[in-house]
Every structure is written in C-alpha cells, then in structure tokens.
Amino acid sequence: GRLSPLQPRRSWHRWQHIYLWVLYGVTVIRWHLYGDFRDMITGTIGERPFTRPRGWDLAVFVIGKLVFFSLALGLPLLFHSIGAVLLFYTLTAAVAGVLLALVFQMAHVVEEADFPVPGEDGLQIDTPWAIHQLETTVDFARDNRALSWFIGGLNFQVEHHLFPRISHVHYPAVSRVVEDTCREFGVPYLEHRTFAAGIASHYRWLRELGRPVATTPICLTDPLTQS
C-alpha cells in the first residue's frame, strides 16, 4: 500500500482503501510463515541490515518457532482435523493482524500525522527528537478506559514514544501533562477523540493517497478539535 506521500503511486493503489483492510489480516500469518525466516536468512529487516543471531540467540529463535508451531498447529491436530486447525489458525492470526495493524496505523498513518523528509544526507531529520514524535504520532480514544486496557495503553502512542520506560497505566495522567505543555509552547498535540474517528481518518488517508493526483495536505484539521 501507499501509506506515505513520499512513496511512489502505483495503479493498484487506487483501491487500497478497500483491499488493505483484508491484507492487514495477512500480516501476522506472513510473519509466522515467511517474514521471520526471510529476515534471518538475508540478515535484513526491510532494507536495513542487522547482525544475525548466533549461538544461544539463534537457539532461542529456533526453539521459539518450534514451540509456537507445536502449540498453534501440532497440539490442535491431535484432536481436530487438518481443515479445522488451519481454519481457526487463519482466523485467529487474521484477527490479530487486523488489530495490530489498526493500532499502529491509527497512530501514524492518518491525515493529521506529518511525514517529514530527511535532510540532504538522507539520514537525519532536522526536527528535534521530541517535536518529531509529536508531529508524527497521533493518540486516539484517550478517554476509553476499556480500550486502553485491551490494547495495553497503545492508544496513547504519543506518550509511548516520549516515555517508553513509563508503565502504560500512567499514560492517561502523563498525556494531560504533555498536552498542557504542548499548548504552553505552541506545539500541536495530535489526537482523535474516539476510536471510530481514528479509523475514519485512516480510511480517508488511504483513499486520498491512492488517487491519481494526491493533493491532500499533511494536516487537514485542527488536532485539538478533531473528534
């Protein structure tokens, strides 16, 4: 999908606001069956190289995969048919993929989030680190305590980025301090008041970026009044 205005547009992106919701469900399945193994073999995550694990770290990876597939597929096969096991594995992984994708897409791939361009060296963003987090990250449904519990406070993505070592149970209180501080210094604090508002913004952003001529400005609304 085309998630950033910096990405080239392809013809199939015209319908990404429809088909990406289905592909989100494949995310976890791809990790389980392909992505992790590919990364280990090629020594890259995306286009970035990393030091491949060896010794004990490699053993942990292999053992972890064996344990996972034993619990996810092997054990159920002792009691159910192959078709039933594959069906429910696919459904479970698809639900996990959609939920995982939505949580992080609503934090970064919405109308209000900025997509800064690196400097001339292509490696460094000119904006200070904390400001960069605030401009590229959007909270959602901060007052929804049930949702906050269900996703472990990840609806407070701004606070998650700024204070990764603080327990998520403190994010509601921290967010009020961050919002007040942003207002004091004239820095935008980006949020959607509800979960539905975040979903809608993500949908509109996908649709806009898929159009032949994407003219959408990076920020379409006042983040302090967005609902």
Task: Mark where each language-model region is.
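Non-catalytic, topology-defining segments of multipass membrane proteins
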Residues: 1-138, 142-151, 169-227
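Solvent-exposed interhelical
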Residues: 163
